[in-house]
Amino acid sequence: MRFKTKIKLGAAAIVGGAIAGVALNKTLDAMVQTHLSRDGITHPKQKLMSKKNQEDMANSPETILGQLFAASTPQINITIPNREGRHINALLYKQSEHSTKYAIVVHGYRSSVKAVSYLARRYFENGFNVLIPYLRAHYGSDYDYCTMGWYERFDIIDWINHIDSTVSGANIVLHGVSMGAATVMMVTGESLPTCVKCAVEDCGYTSVYDAYCYKIPKMMGLPVFAVDLFRHAIKKRIGFDIKEASALNQVRKSCTPTLFLHGDSDTVVPSSMARELYNNARCEKDILIFPDADHVMSPLSNSDKYWNKVWEFADKYLDK
């Protein structure tokens, strides 16, 4: 092969590699936009849950009662500055008579404050004021990107501090579902005021990285190693590391009593994650696995069993 020919082939390889690199970066950036941007979250291109799971959720009596509760109960929209100087928003259901009991209910990924009305109703009917924050990049938030609980944990702590500073003798229960559950666990790994009495996590994941390793290959037909490329794209675009975004590491530091709830038939976040989280938590803890429940379905298909466990657990720690 002549020298000039070798040079041409080498140059072609370099150009081809550069083009492939540009194409890969565009693909990864598109994935970030699809999964974590405001537009990707509010206008999803792919479904996380099966059609049956969605229909079961919509038709559950608990869901319907929650919708009726939201439509008939006075609500207050609250805005406070967070530690970044940005405005964060929440919906508050406030008891007509004075109550120091507060439930901070944290919604899931691609969900909303209204979608967790079935949780809000139960707490409100049990005498709690209920605060439901709008999570980053979801409807009602000013943020452009979601961090799957990692930076959201600081917003929840800012809400906790707001309640602590405005309500004398506040008793706070944290209750999150799916991404909201991971957020709650991430919160409990931080230093919290004594007004936080306990936490309830329902079908949360061990880490954002683990959640993506489980779901992205199934959703997009990609190999698991693609998650590492996605990880670096997220870090470049948004500035957080999905491996560091670990509920597992946070519960290892937690002093907040935590109840772990999960459906054993969960197709989005495997129940093995709940067992791993429970086994690693250093706080006072309890766990209940619902044998036939899919993702977020435990309180909808097993409502009596679910809430009996929640009240049994919370009553141990709330001030009498």
Label each residue range with its predicted role.
Residues C146-V167:
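Alpha/beta-hydrolase active-site loop
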